[in-house]
Curated annotation (Swiss-Prot):
Family: Belongs to the staphylococcal/streptococcal toxin family.
The gene coding this protein: speA
Leader sequence residues: 1-30
Organism: Streptococcus pyogenes phage T12
Pfam families according to UniProt: Stap_Strp_tox_C, Stap_Strp_toxin
Protein name: Exotoxin type A
Gene Ontology CC annotations of this record: extracellular region
Biological-process GO terms, alphabetical: symbiont-mediated modulation of host virulence
Cystine crosslinks: C117-C128
UniProt-listed SUPFAM superfamilies: Bacterial enterotoxins, Superantigen toxins, C-terminal domain
Keywords in alphabetical order: Disulfide bond, Modulation of host virulence by virus, Signal, Toxin, Viral exotoxin, Virulence
Any further remark recorded for this protein: Binds to major histocompatibility complex class II beta chain.
One function term, GO molecular function aspect: toxin activity
Length: 251
């Protein structure tokens, strides 16, 4: 009888430890939302219109292209052209990531910058991005996937809208651009002047990875190239299972 009690106690202890372990691991797995003090305030930002120019215009988009060169071990250069460039460089977080995409057929979707963009001495018409690369083969959907974006303003769920992608695995950069573009065109997130919002961020919630977020506003003294480094990790999400939320506060 005494042995049975000991066995029962061990079983109960094991179940409790397992439950607590799962609970703790889930809490660690989910990234916390930013504290208000972590977010940059738009009213403190000089030349906020430089962010507006990034997201008001069209992004860089190219499909089924291969890299032709490298400047550094962690970047890739493509012979592709747009209205203002004839070469494009993408900078990634490290050499290992660059090697994954080097000489591969890829799709590119990125927010470009020109000031402080350096490819080589003879590259007069060049553009630069961070990340924005996905494999081309086997990554396209026959029917574009709609992703619902839920927007809270001053703590109140205020609206929702859809964005679309034709990729199975899509970069956070592509989704982020489309969300900011919609909010700029329809809700004055960015203007050629002050923003009507004081703080804001976009939160990505993948199914099998920890959530993460991007601050909508830069630090007071910023450059476009430095701000766009948020995309350097080339973070990707499953378009079929990921969720997007936006949180804004007004002035």
């Amino acid at each position: 009888m005494e042995n049975n009690k000991k066995v029962l106690k061990k079983m109960v202890f094991f179940v409790l430890v397992t439950f607590l372990g799962l609970t703790i691991s889930q809490e660690v797995f989910a990234q916390q939302d930013p504290d208000p003090s972590q977010l940059h305030r738009s009213s403190l930002v000089k030349n906020l219109q430089n962010i507006y120019f990034l997201y008001e215009g069209d992004p860089v988009t190219h499909e089924n292209v291969k890299s032709v060169d490298q400047l550094l071990s962690h970047d890739l250069i493509y012979n592709v052209s747009g209205p203002n460039y004839d070469k494009l460089k993408t900078e990634l977080k490290n050499q290992e990531m660059a090697t994954l995409f080097k000489d591969k057929n890829v799709d590119i979707y990125g927010v470009e910058y020109y000031h402080l963009c350096y490819l080589c001495e003879n590259a007069e018409r060049s553009a630069c991005i961070y990340g924005g690369v996905t494999n081309h083969e086997g990554n396209h959907l026959e029917i574009p996937k709609k992703i619902v974006v839920k927007v809270s303003i001053d703590g109140i769920q205020s609206l929702s809208f859809d964005i679309e992608t034709n990729k199975k695995m899509v970069t956070a950069q592509e989704l982020d651009y489309k969300v900011r573009k919609y909010l700029t065109d329809n809700k004055q997130l960015y203007t050629n002047g002050p923003s009507k919002y004081e703080t804001g961020y976009i939160k990505f919630i993948p199914k099998n990875k920890e959530s993460f977020w991007f601050d909508f506003f830069p630090e007071p003294e910023f450059t476009q190239s430095k701000y766009l480094m948020i995309y350097k990790d080339n973070e990707t999400l499953d378009s079929n299972t990921s969720q997007i939320e936006v949180y804004l506060t007004t002035k």
